[in-house]
Amino acid sequence: MPTLVTILLLAACAAVGTEPLPGGPPHHVQGGFRNTNPEFRRPDGWTRTRFLLSRAWANTFDSRSFEAPRVANDGVALRSGAGPGNPGPTITWVGHSTLLVQLEGVTLLTDPQWSERASPLSWAGPRRLSPPGLAFEVLPPINLVLISHDHYDHLDLDTVKRLAAAHDPLFVVPLGLKSWLAGQGVTRVQELDWWGSLEHQGVRVVCVPAQHFSQRSLWDANTRLWASWAVIGASRRLYFGGDTGYFDGFRQAGERLGPFDLTALAIGAYRPAEIMRFTHTTPEEAVQAFEDLRGRILLGIHWGTFDLSEEPLGEPPERMLAEASRRGIPPERAWILKIGETRYW
């Protein structure tokens, strides 16, 4: 146990520089990246270590069970709807932050995660509570994959390799992940800095600032950038938040790129607040972010799939819908999908 505590403490304290590089963007620092919100604070190393230990214990010896509502989806409609002749844009919740989006002939995935655990270890770490809403084998042809950051619940290397082998999509990632993926044998990758963009098969993809952090090992904290994504077609605009705390970046994205037809925002992993408050949104903050983004439809994601935090596992959608109702947002504009559910947007 002392060795484990030492390892976790080192992981919690590992960091890059904090001062912006002369002449560079304000989020670039020596050896990596930082959040630019002057109010941003990360908990001290001991607080993070205590949390990591408590989560390791809970996931190993005191795991909670929960299964989010789900519907069967054999992928037939999605496969028949792929391509330029589809009847309209669709979105399918596979689970956690994994969405399958069909828009104007492009079929894309966000933060694809089909593994049993969100962990570097096959035998430990957060276990999937609900199977994916689509079996990997029934996916339609995937043209594009967006990855928000390198945490294991968002960048699952086994899934990425399977997608590269089976579909050969273009992976679009924040700065620093292209070389890392190349080292894993995944080479069809383009990386972007905040506010950078590219065109792919007629849709525009924009890398949007987020307030979070990155880390996959003891020594690489914040060496790779984190981001949200905007996907802009001729008829629809999608905002995918990935992981982010609430900050002024939502308002900026709404002003520069909005209004958005659909905003997919994380509503889970917000307790304890001393750990989560700057890097994850509460359900109420997600509703505020939706309004900042000038959204038409709010979709709550990042809940009910992995046990990552301490709030009741079924609480996030209840709080999101209650806050949306309190603000006068009608039910047809505040969505909680069942795992596997597809809707037109």
Mark where each language-model region is.
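Active-site metal-binding motif and surrounding structural segment of the metallo-beta-lactamase
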Residues: 48, 123-172, 188-190, 258-264
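Acidic/histidine-rich helix-loop elements
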Residues: 112-132, 213-220, 271-280, 307
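Bacterial N-terminal signal peptides
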Residues: 2-12
